[in-house]
Amino acid sequence: MSPILINMLLAFTISLIGLLIYRSHMMSSLLCLEGMMLSLFILTSTLALTMHFTLMTMMPIILLVFAACEAAIGLSLLVMVSNTYGLDYVQNLNLLQC
């Protein structure tokens, strides 16, 4: 395996571990999710370039679109929860249920 692939897999793993450890605050969870999406974007981009798949060249762009949508929805949810409750704890999201 090339060092770039190892680094991207390590970055994804560190972001996943960070998501599991720092899950109490919503902002840190969103940052870890963004780190995971960025490492997946770089990983799919390098795989598409090294494998020379013509059908796989659109995959990084699609992944980037989903990452932007996820970031927008996550930030709007963070603003809504922090304006309503004054906190960004993930435990307060259970209060949003009917």
Curated annotation (Swiss-Prot):
Presence of keyword Glycoprotein:
no
Which class of enzymes does this protein belong to? translocase
Q: Where in the cell is it found?
A: Mitochondrion inner membrane
Q: What EC identifiers does the entry list?
A: 7.1.1.2
**Transmembrane stretches, start-end:** 1-21, 30-50, 61-81
Tell me one GO biological process term: ATP synthesis coupled electron transport
Q: What protein name is recorded for this chain?
A: NADH-ubiquinone oxidoreductase chain 4L
Q: Quick one: which gene encodes this?
A: MT-ND4L
